[in-house]
Amino acid sequence: LEEAQLIRTELKPGVRGSMKLCLRQNDELLLLLRKGEKKKKEEVISMPVGNYVDYKVAPTCGIVNTEDYIDGEDEPRCFYNPLRTTAKLVWFAKGYLEYRFPNAGIQNGQVRRLELSAELCSEAPDYNMEWPSDITLWINQREAGTWTCPSDFGGRRGKLNPDWWEDKNTQYGKLKVWTLEENGTYLDGKKVNDVSVTDYCLADGPFISVRIGVKEDAKHQGGVNLFGNSFGDYPQDIVMRILYE
């Protein structure tokens, strides 16, 4: 008690020697009990670019894996080929791809933040450094922001591209990051709207819908190249990070 400075002691003369006198240091004690802090958890889901569940595309379009083209080029019907799940690069001039991410882990929690990142660029025949495209992300049918990509990037080889991929083709993209926060939605750290993470209703359905594409009324309808973990500059697929309590 002395070490905790709750009391102090003094020695006083007594009838048969000395006695120890205990004196309190404080008149009142206030005891505060901390509320248990909710532990935050993070779930990371990597979605291969060929694992789309729905699409609407128009030429120029195609799919490749690390070995070769999957079916022919510029034929939207080829996007149904079951080998699409091995795809490492997907491209299309118009339309969208839709993915479904699992949400079982957040059913009993509260989502604080969702982050989605992917390597992207425009789509032109071969490549074209002057080819803008307004690439939009939708999450559960709500717009999460549009990035105007300036180019279908080429002119130097993508760091991960296999040797057989020709130099005249699209080579790399830019890594773009959309973030859903409690106070709004951000693209590469810049706020794009006031739609909060709760507004996307991430746990309401059986999955989280993610759609990447170009609007039919977009100013720059320059298509999309979507890179997997073996093409372009970044060794990743479409990556979703969910922070929840």
Where are each of the predicted segments found?
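Extracellular and analogous surface-interaction loops
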Residues: 98-112, 197-203
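Extended, solvent-exposed segments with strong compositional bias
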Residues: 77-92, 150-203, 220
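Short, cationic-aromatic polyanion-contact patches
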Residues: 10-35
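Proprotein-processing/basic-patch segments
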Residues: 213-245
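Short coil-to-beta strand junction motifs in C2/discoidin
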Residues: 127-139
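A short, conserved structural fragment
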Residues: 2-12
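Amphipathic alpha-helical dimerization/coiled-coil segments
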Residues: 29-85
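A short beta-strand element within beta-rich, extracytoplasmic domains
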Residues: 109-129
